[in-house]
């Protein structure tokens, strides 16, 4: 077959395959055009998941009659100066969206510029343009797309259900609404109830309001402001505390110069910043906005414009990690506080079942305050109970009291230890409430931070075992451990092969004290199996530190003396990120006195 020039209609349909993948792609292009036109309000309507109809109306600048005729031609745009691909400041710039949509659907554009006496309307069906005719519309533009892919019916079979396509449209509008909180958005359609996001005030407060409206109240309550700037690059936004996570990375919203993007570099930086806070199977929630000189960012990577390249990618990654780590460290203790009512909900008593005609006066026992104390006043009774609980030899001791904690400790952030319950949780009293601490989770974070500090300095001090521990493992596990022996030695864990299926442990980290070497090695080997070969050395070392910290921490079930409990609280106050353990779980919860009084109906 000889080489020949393809007809314009075929060329447009081929181009549409890159720009218009599904109805959500159409909505994205049209809403971006509205934003570039300076709109302050954008209304989106869909029907049939966008297959039957898509409508986008804005109050932007609109177009004159002559511009409307050119707007549906390929590579015709008002957003790009000649040869200025490096200084792109708009969301659109390729001049492909409208002709691509018109090539595969029925497209109708009605627009009016402020100086025009009336609006103008143009229809494009399957790439064929109609005459421009007068129409009625206030300032702005209305674009209607019907029968999407009617000109290329083979594409229809690749679309999902109406509900799935409608959800994809919703996600596109959500991202664009997050990028521009100063613009009001409405999203309506037969598949959903209308959603309206009113324009927010400028600044961080307005941005958080819009993010909270879209991502929900749990994100608003857990949001930590982050900001960093270096060499003309600004990273700002909000990141959720480690207590709010997702099972996937879909809760991470990234914007570069106002453009929603999916960038592996930024996603990797977010994950790295949270590596000390979250378990491996959980992902953070964040909305980050990167602002840089357009000449330092290449937005012309793909026709869909969802990918970007940075001239100095290392700077951007480092800045994101720094901003997030600084924000997380600054708000470290806030992650464990009672901000969303979860603690109050857990404490609320369930109503006791009682007969309808129940009367307390006919109850076998009188109210507590109507009965005399037997054996002394309440203080004496509690003192005796506390003394019995502090007796380590008592086999049934389940609650340990310190009836008279030092008064000055009550004013400390984590208060004075009052009791240990179930040999797992420390209850402390503060000036305005109480705190419940998970002793293992808290000590795990302390040990982890100590290991990190020691590693950054002169290395972890080690203790030589008089008699090496011989740990029997399968040969594959032994091989994994020996291959990583150099990395383990950095943490004071010296191992060597001891014949087939065994490892000799000759030195252990002093910080961990006496440990179960066999259990530690098995856990380390299991985690090493999950490591990717490309995982950076620093990340691998942090995984080792986290595993060691877990094995070297105070276990649940260990009875603590009052002075030990207070010492743990003081160490928590001096330890960075002490609000959550290495797995992202809270180390303590706080209940304010006001909340306690509400529980008992005093407020």
UniProtKB/Swiss-Prot annotation:
A GO molecular-function descriptor: ATP-dependent DNA damage sensor activity
InterPro entries named among the record's database cross-references: DNA_mismatch_repair_CS, DNA_mismatch_repair_MutL, DNA_mismatch_S5_2-like, HATPase_C_sf, MutL/Mlh/PMS, MutL/Mlh/Pms-like, MutL_C, MutL_C_dimsub
Gene Ontology CC: mismatch repair complex
CDD domains the UniProt entry points to: HATPase_MutL-MLH-PMS-like (cd16926), MutL_Trans (cd00782)
Cysteines joined through disulfide linkages: none
Protein name: DNA mismatch repair protein MutL
Pfam families per record: DNA_mis_repair, HATPase_c_3, MutL_C
Keyword rRNA processing in annotation: no
Lineage: Bacteria, Pseudomonadati, Pseudomonadota, Alphaproteobacteria, Hyphomicrobiales
Gene source species: Nitrobacter winogradskyi (strain ATCC 25391 / DSM 10237 / CIP 104748 / NCIMB 11846 / Nb-255)
PROSITE patterns listed in its UniProt record: DNA_MISMATCH_REPAIR_1 (PS00058)
Residue ranges the record marks as coiled coil: none
Top-level taxon of the source organism: Bacteria
GO biological process: mismatch repair
Cell membrane keyword on record: no
Record-stated family: Belongs to the DNA mismatch repair MutL/HexB family.
Keywords from the named record: DNA damage, DNA repair
Function in brief: This protein is involved in the repair of mismatches in DNA. It is required for dam-dependent methyl-directed DNA mismatch repair. May act as a 'molecular matchmaker', a protein that promotes the formation of a stable complex between two or more DNA-binding proteins in an ATP-dependent manner without itself being part of a final effector complex.
